[in-house]
């Protein structure tokens, strides 16, 4: 894949979030409620060490704000073993499915439950590494982590 990107070939990135299982009266009409996006463009490897470190910091801080300043920064060996790709987005496509099942008209009379089982991704209480030295508290950014920001 990295050779493909380095050669300047087009790339795509797909992200899908499943919001619910749609349970119809007929197995044929079972589905999922979801949000999906496909990005199309051309990628490039981020190679200069300073730019790569900056990209890793931005990514780390996006995932867990405050972590970059607390964690050990990547050493030379780790940086050399890590590839970072930037994608110049040329176009995008999104698709969303929401709502209840859509059954065949005659199936609405069946004595079979139908509906949606909502799903969500949820951050739970942090669990300390079993090898964590004693006396190191859970940092605020981990204790108060919220994926809805």
Residue positions per predicted region:
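C-terminal edge-of-domain segments
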Residues: 47, 51-149
């Amino acid at each position: 894949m990295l050779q493909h990107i380095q050669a300047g070939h087009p790339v795509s990135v797909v992200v899908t979030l499943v919001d619910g299982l749609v349970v119809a009266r007929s197995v044929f009409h079972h589905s999922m409620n979801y949000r999906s996006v496909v990005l199309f463009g051309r990628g490039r490897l981020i190679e200069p060490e300073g730019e790569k470190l900056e990209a890793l910091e931005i990514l780390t801080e996006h995932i867990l704000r405050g972590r970059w300043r607390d964690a050990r920064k990547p050493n030379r060996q780790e940086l050399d073993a890590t590839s970072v790709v930037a994608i110049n987005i040329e176009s995008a496509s999104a698709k969303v499915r929401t709502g209840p099942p859509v059954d065949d008209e005659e199936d609405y009379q069946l004595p079979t439950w139908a509906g949606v089982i909502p799903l969500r991704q949820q951050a739970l209480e942090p669990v300390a590494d079993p090898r964590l030295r004693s006396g190191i508290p859970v940092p605020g950014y981990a204790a108060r982590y919220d994926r809805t920001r």
